A protein has these predicted regions:
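Conserved catalytic core of the tyrosine transesterase superfamily
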Residues: 1-193
Length: 193
């Protein structure tokens, strides 16, 4: 018998508002780095392994170059405000970094997966009411929020680096409230009431 696939767990938009996120962070190196990690996960949907693999040269003014699964490279657009956050982080990072990895510890060495996982888990614990907290939850959240705000499946597939559309379709789990809202706005009889 076929087992049912679990729906992705995701945070609500208001839980990850810029104002709410800003309240958690100061201006020291660790705070700036951690906020940038959180924002990159949420605003780009990249995987933990992709974040750790990022080099400084992979960042350009409106995009980042990501090396995904099976060494597939993809370009992901970033907002101007996210690029400014990256620049502010680089100003703190460059004097201490040992190598070209974008994300480093305060001793200049590259980040490692367990460190990032634990830090994101802590941050999501302060921001959300989710039971499950991880970088991958931010990937699910990115995908869900993109679809809920009008992104198409093909676009989302490209942004997430999925090999097939079937992998992306798991994010079409709109809430009933959203389905009802779309129905009310789109069906001609509902628009007349």
């Amino acid at each position: 018998p076929k087992t049912e696939k679990r729906l992705p767990v995701f945070a609500r938009e208001k839980e990850l508002s810029p104002e709410r996120i800003s309240t958690l962070f100061g201006n020291d190196f660790n705070a700036v780095r951690d906020k940038l990690m959180l924002e990159l996960f949420y605003q780009t949907g990249i995987r933990l392994s992709e974040l750790i693999a990022l080099n400084v040269a992979d960042v350009q003014s409106h995009q980042i170059k990501v090396l995904g699964k099976r060494n597939k490279e993809r370009i992901i657009p970033i907002s101007h405000s996210l690029f400014k956050e990256i620049q502010a982080y680089l100003n703190l990072r460059n004097p201490i970094a040992k190598g070209n990895k974008l994300f480093v510890l305060s001793n200049g060495k590259p980040l490692y997966p367990v460190f990032v996982y634990r830090r994101i888990n802590e941050l999501l614990g302060s921001l959300t009411t989710l039971d499950k907290k991880s970088p991958h939850i931010l990937r699910h959240t990115f995908a869900t929020h993109m679809l809920n705000n009008g992104a198409g499946l093909e676009t989302l597939k490209a942004l997430l680096g999925h090999a097939s559309l079937a992998a992306t379709q798991v994010y079409t789990h709109n809430s009933f409230a959203q389905l009802a809202q779309i129905y009310t706005q789109a069906h001609p009889r509902m628009m007349r009431d």
